[in-house]
Structures are given as structure tokens and as C-alpha cells.
UniProtKB/Swiss-Prot annotation:
The lineage of its organism: Eukaryota, Metazoa, Chordata, Craniata, Vertebrata. This is Zinc metalloproteinase-disintegrin-like bothrojarin-3. Expressed by the venom gland. Residues 2-88 form the Disintegrin domain. GO terms for cellular component: extracellular region; plasma membrane. Disulfide bonds join C5-C34, C16-C29, C18-C24, C28-C51, C42-C48, C47-C73, C60-C80, C67-C99, C92-C104, C111-C161, C126-C168, C139-C149, C156-C193. It comes from Bothrops jararaca (Jararaca).
Amino acid sequence: SPPVCGTELLEVGEECDCGSPTNCRNPCCDATTCKLHSWVECESGECCEQCRFIKAGNVCRPQRSECDIAESCTGQSADCPTDDIQRNGQPCLNNFGYCYNGMCPIMYHQCIALFGASATVSPDSCFDSNLDGQGLFYCRRERARIFPCAKEDVKCGRLFCNYFQSSCLYQYSGDIDFGMVDDGTKCAEGKVCNSN
């Protein structure tokens, strides 16, 4: 059967159906024909407003962090462009870190997440435990085998933090990655941790 215009049900052959002309609340739809008005560019989307594309340059997805990129409408589409991030390795947080997959992982923030707001990163000497490759102190794990850190990689194993008067503190749990320095964390100038 042919579509019946004005039922508020989108049927085959209709571009829109917003009900009767007196009840229609969709400015893009011609309620008498159930077709979109000829001037309509879009009906919905982050970059669509009053049936027209929002002009180019209007931000549709704000920057969430220093390693994220704000997206703006193109003026040619109702959709916000694909979410994009800064390239990996871009310096961030005043050169304390490098962007990694849209984040700026630094040890200081990881210590705060593990111990609380007063936590700081322990002195370099604490990280030497990662040279042992014993127990919880290592750089890499493959199944049951653990691999010690090389001297230049000691800051890519277990994370050591100071909390109030205590130093060389670390955390661990059943999750083997818990308490380890996060991948992408700056460990030296021009170098980041990578568990692979």
C-alpha cells in the first residue's frame, strides 16, 4: 500500500514524516508532502543546525587534553570529523612527558593515582631494584618468565613513589600490570617506556 503522509511513521517513499502540518515540529520536513524542503542540507548531527550545515571552523568536539586535537565542523557535512590526537612523541606537560595515544603519561601523575595527592616520584636509586628481575621488580613478563630491566630501562619497570615520610614505595595486585610504569611514559630525554 502507498505511504500515508502525516502519521509520524517513516514509510517507504517518505523522506520524513512529522505528523500533520499543524503538529509538525521538524523545520526540515514539508508536512504536506513528507519530503525534505529543497533547501535542507541536513536533519541532524553535531554540525547541523536548523537544517543547515554549521559553518566551517565551529568546534564540534573540544580538545580534552594537551595530546588531543579539537575537531571543527567542515561546513560540508552534518558529522563532526573523526576524533584525532596529537602524534605520539609530541612533548607535553612542559616537556615532562610525550603524547602517547592521546594521553600524556608521566610518573608523577601515576604516583598520585596509586598513593594519593601528596605522592611524588621516588629518587632514581629506588628504581635500581628493577635491575634484579626478581619477584615484582622487572621490566617485562612473558607468561611465567620475568626479564630484568637494562640499566637504561630501570624507570620502565615497577613504579616507585614517595608518600609523606616514606620513599621507594610500590604497589602490586593480582593484575600483573598494576603498579608498573605505564607504556608511553617518558623515561629519559627522547625515550619512552614500551612493554614490547
